[in-house]
UniProtKB/Swiss-Prot annotation:
One Gene Ontology molecular-function label: UDP-4-amino-4-deoxy-L-arabinose aminotransferase
Post-translational modification N6-(pyridoxal phosphate)lysine, affected residues: K182
Acetylation is among the record's keywords: no
Gene Ontology CC, one term: membrane
Keywords, sorted A to Z: Aminotransferase, Antibiotic resistance, Lipid A biosynthesis, Lipid biosynthesis, Lipid metabolism, Lipopolysaccharide biosynthesis, Pyridoxal phosphate, Transferase
Protein name (database record): UDP-4-amino-4-deoxy-L-arabinose--oxoglutarate aminotransferase
Entry EC no(s): 2.6.1.87
Pathway participation: Nucleotide-sugar biosynthesis; UDP-4-deoxy-4-formamido-beta-L-arabinose biosynthesis; UDP-4-deoxy-4-formamido-beta-L-arabinose from UDP-alpha-D-glucuronate: step 2/3; Bacterial outer membrane biogenesis; lipopolysaccharide biosynthesis
CDD domains in the record: AHBA_syn
Catalytic reaction annotation: UDP-4-amino-4-deoxy-beta-L-arabinose + 2-oxoglutarate = UDP-beta-L-threo-pentopyranos-4-ulose + L-glutamate
Highest taxon above the source species: Bacteria
Chain's gene name: arnB
Length: 382
C-alpha cells in the first residue's frame, strides 16, 4: 500500500534533535539564552531592529494589539480571508473587527477596500501576507501614513518572503509564526518584529506577566531579583527548547524555501492542463516563500465540488488542507455579522484547496498528486 502523503510535514533532522538535547542538558530549558540568540539571529535575517520571541503568533498578535492600546470602541481593519485567531484577538479585546474583501486571484487585501473602511474609530490595519507572497506594502504604508493608523503585518505565512528588495519584517511591525506547518517551525512559537523601540518594550512586558524582565534576566544577567509588574500581562514567552529548534530551522531557511519553490514550479507546470485554478502571484517584484500551494476548485468547471475532490484525494492516500474558511462564515461571526457580504472572499472560501507541499517531498510526490487529480477529474467528466 502506498504511504499516506500529508499536505504538510515538519522537516526535522539530527541537528534539531542535538539542539534540543543540548538545552535539556544545560539545566535551563525555559526562556533563556537560546531565546535571546533566536531574537538576535532573526533580526540579522530580516534586518529588523527589535524581535520578540513568543509562544505563538496568536499570542504575539494579542500583546501587539494591547501594546497599541486597542480596546472597546476601537475598530481594526483586516480581511475575513485569514485564520480566525486575528479576528478573535480583536474581538476579545472588546474592539470591532472590520472585515474587508480580498483580490479574487491573489487573496491579498486591496488598498481601496481598506481605505473605504477607515473611520475615526480605526486604530489598526492588519493585512495578511498570504500563502508566502507579500501584500502590496507600498500602497498599505501610504494609507497608514496618510491616516496615522498603525500597520500590523500578519506575516505568519511569510518567513523568508521579500517585498520588492526588502525582507518582510525589515520595516514596521510584523508577526511571524513557527507553527508545525510553517516554513520554519519549533512545534509552537512565533516572533514579533518592529522598528518601534517603545512598542517593543511594551510587548516584552505584556508577554511575560507585565514584568520588566524575565527569569533569565533576573537570575543570570545580574538584573534585580525582584522584578516589578508594570502592567497586567500574560504568559506568552517562548521556551529555550523551542527556540533551539527554531535557531536550527532558521539556518536552513534558504534551502527550505528553495525546495518549496522547486516543488511549486513543478506543480504549476503539471497542472496547466487541468481545470483547477492556482492562486495568482502578485505582479509587483517579490520573493515568494511558497508556504502553501493552493488551487481553487470551481464545481462548474471541474465537475466536482472542492469537498468532493478533497474526499476523493483522501481515497488515493493524499492529504489536503483548507486555508481558510472565511472568518465571517464561521458560526459566531456569521451570527454576529449576518449582513456582511464579501463576494470574492466567499467564492474563494468555498473553493480553496491546499495541496501537499513541504521540503522533504520528492518530485515523484508532486507527480503522484497530479496523476491522482487527473484521474479523479477525468472520471467525473466521463
Amino acid at each position: 500500500m502506498t504511504d499516506f502523503l500529508p499536505f504538510s510535514r515538519p522537516s526535522m533532522g539530527e541537528e534539531e534533535i542535538a539542539a534540543v538535547a543540548e538545552v535539556l542538558r544545560s539545566g535551563w530549558i525555559t526562556t533563556g539564552p537560546k531565546c535571546q540568540q533566536l531574537e538576535q539571529a532573526f533580526c540579522q535575517q530580516v534586518g529588523c531592529r527589535q524581535a520578540i520571541a513568543v509562544s505563538s503568533a496568536t499570542g504575539g498578535m494579542h500583546v501587539t494589539l494591547m501594546a497599541l492600546g486597542i480596546g472597546p470602541g476601537d475598530e481594526v481593519i483586516t480581511p475575513s480571508q485569514t485564520w480566525v485567531s486575528t479576528v478573535n484577538m480583536i474581538t476579545l479585546l472588546g474592539a470591532e473587527p472590520v472585515m474587508v474583501d480580498v483580490d479574487r486571484h491573489t487573496l491579498m487585501v486591496r488598498p481601496q477596500d481598506i481605505e473605504a473602511a477607515i473611520t475615526p474609530k480605526t486604530k489598526a490595519i492588519i493585512p495578511v501576507h498570504y500563502a508566502g507572497a507579500p501584500a502590496d506594502l507600498t500602497a498599505l504604508r501610504t494609507l497608514s501614513e496618510r491616516y496615522g493608523i498603525p500597520l500590523i503585518e500578519d506575516a505568519a505565512h511569510a518567513v523568508g518572503t521579500q517585498y520588492r528588495d526588502e525582507w518582510i519584517g525589515a520595516r514596521g511591525t510584523a508577526i511571524f509564526s513557527f507553527h508545525a506547518i510553517k516554513n520554519i517551525t519549533c512545534a509552537e512559537g512565533g516572533m514579533v518584529v518592529t522598528d518601534d523601540e517603545a512598542l517593543a518594550e511594551r510587548i516584552r512586558s505584556l508577554k511575560f506577566h507585565g514584568l520588566g524582565v524575565d527569569a533569565f534576566d533576573r537570575q543570570r544577567q545580574g538584573r534585580k531579583p525582584q522584578a516589578e509588574v508594570v502592567t497586567p500581562g500574560f504568559k506568552y514567552n517562548l521556551a529555550d527548547i523551542n527556540a533551539a529548534i527554531a535557531l536550527v530551522q532558521l539556518d536552513k531557511l534558504p534551502a527550505i524555501n528553495a525546495r518549496r519553490q522547486q516543488l511549486a514550479a513543478r506543480y504549476l507546470t503539471q497542472l496547466r492542463s487541468l481545470p483547477l485554478q492556482p492562486l495568482a502571484v502578485p505582479d509587483y517584484p517579490h520573493l515568494h516563500a511558497w508556504h502553501l500551494f493552493m488551487v481553487r476548485v470551481d464545481e462548474t468547471r471541474c465537475g466536482i465540488s472542492r469537498d468532493g475532490l478533497m474526499a476523493a484525494l483522501q481515497t488515493h492516500g493524499i492529504g489536503t488542507g483548507l486555508h481558510f474558511r472565511a472568518v465571517h462564515t464561521q458560526k459566531y461571526y456569521r451570527e454576529r455579522y449576518p449582513h456582511l457580504h464579501l463576494p470574492e472572499t466567499e467564492w474563494n472560501s468555498a473553493s480553496l484547496m491546499t495541496l501537499p507541499l513541504f521540503p522533504d517531498m520528492q518530485d515523484s510526490d508532486v507527480d503522484r498528486v497530479v496523476v491522482a487529480l487527473t484521474s479523479i477529474l477525468e472520471s467525473v467528466r466521463d
